[in-house]
Amino acid sequence: MKFDQTSDKIADRVRNLRSSAVRDLFAAAVRPDIISLSGGMPDVSLLPQRAIQKAVHAAITDERAVALQYGSTNGRLETRQALCDIMRDIGVRVKPEEMLLTSGAQQALNLLGETFLDKGDIVLVEGPTYLTALSAFNAYEPEIHSVPFDDEGMRMDLLEEELKRIGKGNKRLKMLYTIPNFQNPGGVTMTGERRKRLIELSHEYDFMIIEDDPYGRLRYEGGHMVPLKAQDDRVIYLGTISKIFAPGLRIGWICAPADVLARISLVKQGADLCGSTFDQVVVEH
């Protein structure tokens, strides 16, 4: 049986999906005659290979009974505790029961879309934003509304104007997705003043903030910015090991209130039962 975009067997929400341009460029990057600038692929020689070797050895010898077995949907408790310690370093106090491990932050984006978005719901993003986040959300057929940014991050005056326009319509605003540190692709960092105002607006207009923070630890000058999550527990925070350890170890995490996380966990059960316990043990070590 031949399947194409006209097939009546394909779900409507999938029929109009398009591949991310970034992933298409990754596919071309395997050619030996190509020097790829398409994605944030680190130089392998700079990765902590010796530390990874030791961690893999520990996983396969000392903890093989755990590392080679199924795990819990929310992720290994010890790994979550280790990541909670990392979060504490940036000013976010979170408990293991408020964290769920994912297959990279990309799976986290998809889980959030499946958990929260109905067709026609509104998602606010920085314009432009991370293309593959849009790919994750678009599977659930929301309306994506972009808000411009400048050198200080998303323009709060323009955001407030957009919120007022949305309030006059009949569509539901569900969430705002932001990369406040070294925004992708803009590279800008949201100021502390604008972060405070964003949180105020989220309460006034009752929408969720999704804080995607893969780059926050890559700051080499100046002090670290206080995460939105540290200022408001309602914020859903996404982290990843990809940019600070190795992208081949597919470990990301969601920090959210426990009742919200319980809903996301139900969705993850249907997606993959559990993440890679082996990767979790390696990261923990």
Predicted ranges, named:
Residues 212:
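Glycine-centered flexible beta-alpha turn that most often forms the glycine-rich phosphate-binding loop
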Residues 45-47, 109, 133, 186, ...:
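Glycine/Thr-rich phosphate-binding loops of Rossmann-like dinucleotide-binding domains
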Residues 2-72:
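N-terminal "arm"/small-domain region of PLP-dependent enzymes with the aminotransferase-like
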Residues 61, 66-205, 216-231, 236:
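Conserved core of the PLP fold type I
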